[in-house]
Regions:
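Aromatic/hydrophobic pocket-lining residues that form the small-molecule binding cavity
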Residues: 49, 53, 81, 107
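A generic secondary-structure signal
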Residues: 18, 59-63, 109, 113, ...
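Nucleotide 5′-phosphate-binding alpha/beta core
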Residues: 14-15, 48, 75, 109-112
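Carrier-protein-dependent adenylate-forming modules in NRPS/ANL systems
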Residues: 30-32, 36, 91-93, 97, ...
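Conserved ATP-dependent adenylate/AMP-binding module captured primarily in the ANL superfamily
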Residues: 85, 100-131
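N-lobe entry segment of adenylate-forming
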Residues: 1-63, 67, 91
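Conserved AMP-binding/adenylate-forming
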Residues: 40, 57-105
Length: 132
């Protein structure tokens, strides 16, 4: 029965990498610039965005993020939230994408349960993170 399914496990980085390799010149157009990826501008390609994801992953690694670490991504709802999760996945870290609507008390619960994770945030959620 399993031979009927062409299944590949979901891995955010591997899936993005494969898309970038197969279709590097396919355009990606944004309606606004992405704060966490300003170099992408309003228009990029899979290939170019893949390189920016790697740069961000290397920056996260330089901050100490490594395999198995949890990273709460708690920021405004933009496409860069997903790209940050892909960068974390490259390092074999575990991205935890959390809605920016949640109060700091909920984030405190995440921090406790995830055993002191990294938190990526932006100006929209900075005040709530300071309260954690």
């Amino acid at each position: 029965m399993t031979h009927l399914l062409d299944y590949q496990p979901l891995n955010l980085y591997t899936n993005y990498q494969e898309a970038a390799e197969k279709t590097p010149t396919v355009p990606i157009i944004f309606d606004e610039s992405l704060p966490a990826f300003p170099a992408l501008g309003l228009e990029t390609t899979y290939g170019e965005s893949h390189q920016e994801i790697l740069k961000r992953a290397y920056q996260l690694a330089a901050l100490g993020v490594k395999k198995g670490d949890k990273i709460i991504i708690y920021k405004s709802p933009k496409f860069d939230t997903y790209l940050l999760a892909v960068a974390a996945s490259y390092l074999a870290a575990v991205p935890v994408m959390v809605s920016y609507h949640l109060p700091f008390e909920t984030i405190e619960v995440f921090v406790d349960r995830l055993e002191d994770p990294y938190i990526l945030f932006d100006d929209v959620t900075a005040e709530k993170v300071q309260a954690v």
